[in-house]
Amino acid sequence: MITITFSLTNQNKFFVKIKKADVMKLEYKYQKEMTFIGYYTEIKMNEGYEKCPEFWDKEYGEKYSKLFTTMIPENDVERAILENNIGMYALCVDNGGEFQYWIAGEYKGGSVPDGFSLYSFPESEWALFSTKGPSLLPFRN
């Protein structure tokens, strides 16, 4: 099991503590403003470990598995997924006692299909976690 703890300081910086981090790479990087496109759900802070994987399975796995077999979009939603690499990012946006959990991609312009939203982060320092292999496996085990 991997435990990730985020702490936000009063200077809008955060610290990350990871246990069993040998399966993930952590890199700090300054990023210019970035805008993402995707879809999200509201999750209570104490339910993230259970609800985040469920959201991926339901919203991404079940709905778009055919798309990733053919790589031929059949509608505006599938086109947006391919053009913006939706699924490349999992974003967590604090919303008080809950957080918005996003399945997202970097917005490259164009139309925003119904059910999708845009979210922009100001320029700041980022903590980037990456892994090779099946997506979400490090968070689920």
Where are the regions a protein language model picked out?
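A solvent-exposed interaction/effector surface
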Residues: 4-141
